[in-house]
Structure formats: C-alpha cells, structure tokens
A protein has these predicted regions:
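Short, helix-capping/interhelical loops that line the mouth of catalytic, cofactor-
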Residues: 1-15, 63-118
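Helix-loop segments that flank and shape redox-cofactor active sites
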Residues: 25-49, 67-74, 117-122
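Ligand-binding pocket scaffold of soluble enzyme catalytic domains
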Residues: 57
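Short Ser/Thr-interspersed hydrophobic loop/turn segments at strand-loop and sheet-helix junctions
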Residues: 60
C-alpha cells in the first residue's frame, strides 16, 4: 500500500485554479478593511501572529508547489527564516522582522499568480 498513491482524487486544472484564486480572494476580502495595527494579536499559545500566518501559508504554497515541484527560486529572499514553522518556534514568531501587511499581501498575490500559472502550464 502506498498511501499517497492509493488514496487520491482528480480535479481538472480549471477547478484547481479556481480553488487557488478563491482562497486568495476570500483572504483579501477578510483583511481588506483592516489597518496595520489590527493584524497584531497578543502572544497566545493557541494562535500565531496573524501577519505571520498569512506569510506562512503563502510560504508553504511557494515552497511545496513552486520551489519543490517546479524548481523555482524563492520569491521572497529570507522567507524560510521568517515563515518556516518547522524551524521557528511558536513564541519566536512574535519578534520576527516581518514584512509589512501590504508587503505580505503582495507576496501572497505573487505566489498565488505563480501557482495559477504553473497549474495552467500543465
């Protein structure tokens, strides 16, 4: 038995592209009217800094879907040192020199666009 091969499903390229675009659009809708200060949350064991979380999810999209599968170079220099949850302890995430909210959202859009482009190219 090969779990990753035996249990799978198939989606069309168009469906995958729409899912990626929908996730990005929903995220942007949720944060569009927030001010920079509203992205800051107190240090709690159950949550991550919100701005860090946006960058982290984007970093994993980039790392797994673009860098590893597509052998592309990082779009954000140093992203691994900021957003890799395998390397960065939970409490340390609050003191990282993260990009601004606007820069984080721009990074998210660049990665989303590149993922869509990669999907449409296959």
């Amino acid at each position: 038995m090969q779990p990753l091969y035996d249990k799978h499903f198939t989606l069309s390229t168009a469906a995958l592209v729409r899912m990626v675009q929908d996730a990005g659009e929903r995220t942007l809708e949720l944060v569009a009217d927030l001010e920079e200060a509203q992205f800051e949350v107190p240090l709690l064991a159950l949550v991550n800094p919100f701005r860090w979380e946006l960058g982290h999810v984007t970093f994993f999209y980039e790392m797994f879907l673009l860098q590893l599968l597509g052998q592309t170079k990082p779009m954000l220099v140093g992203a691994e040192d900021l957003y890799d949850s395998f390397k960065i302890d939970h409490d340390d995430r609050w003191s990282l020199p993260l990009p601004s909210c606007q820069q984080t959202l721009e990074y998210m859009q660049r990665v989303s666009d590149a993922v869509v482009e990669r999907l449409q190219g296959h």
